[in-house]
């Protein structure tokens, strides 16, 4: 579950708030609101998603195992012990060429960054992912949370999640996912641009 404190930035008495929760292990949410308008989303663990927690060791090449059952196509990692933002790996950074050499930040509109200080220039595998020795991602005093995503099908072979990319143009672009998505997150990787989110609840 999740508890909101009384700080204005997190729980304003008469404000509207949106919450997206990937509760991969339990699958429940207890939420109390007082005169507020609140939207909440939860994903019980299934195909294409995994949550990993780990403690850093300040050693470049530190490997972290996961249980995704596939090669992660996107990863978000957050140092829970500091104010560092979320660092993002995506299989299509740099046009899909050596994407492990690049990263994005969820808390930033900046373009992709070429730097081995995050993923140690090492691609993730179906068993784990590799980190540099930077404090943002692998401090010996830091405790971290990693969200891992991969394209996946249900038991009948129907697609249920998709991690991908597309090239923009000056005209309308149709992006085919193979199913009707209910949650879409977009970020321009090659240049400055805000993260854009669409979901079926708000239209």
Mark where each language-model region is:
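Surface-exposed molecular-recognition determinants
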Residues: 1-203
